[in-house]
């Protein structure tokens, strides 16, 4: 029967030799016919239902329902790369600034950035991960992290704090196009996008680049050796308008010349809004003008 099978399974695991510490055995019930692990109840057969992992000087509580990189040493390389992309040579560049960590999971990146900025706001749709993020922040003595449970697309309309920097670490399918639009509307000068699926990344980058952002840096981290999977870190920056030289023309007194009124950014935005009912960002207008 099931109890005898589980008892034998537990015994087989406990009597083996391990280099590390054996923390626990959990039995997750799943009677679904689908090829997916759907939790219908979890039973602790031995030990604890969690363990602690240390990463870049911080401590994280990991549960079966927390998203955390399986390759811990590789995760240190990944997050150190992301931190270097964000801070660059100026370690005080985020001093006094607000950072958004969107799709924040258990808040790993948010907590790595918290010591060097005023506040980090993490948004994650999985409530268990948000609870773990709050617990981990308290564990690490970080009081400037705020984690919100909800869909990024909806939560962005509710957050009062405006970001100075945005970090993106979405699931494999990437970012919803409408969410990308809202992210771009903030007009932050720099962003870092961490992706685990190159095709989703390529699709999303096309949207960012069409709206005025450009790729400054890109780095791939081989988190899963001997597989085709790879994590990619991309730094995006908002394109600056091309430098202009101001020229003043003063026609002769006898001339009948009247300067033609030019379309300003505000007039273009007003025209598009009236004619098509669409709000356009200044950076998008600048991109079209350059084309």
Model-derived features with residue positions:
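Carbohydrate-binding surface patches
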Residues: 1
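DNA-recognition alpha helix
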Residues: 264-276, 287-291
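Rossmann-like S-adenosyl-L-methionine
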Residues: 4-257, 265-266
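Short aromatic/hydrophobic-glycine micro-motifs
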Residues: 213, 277-278
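Residues in the helix-turn-helix
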Residues: 284
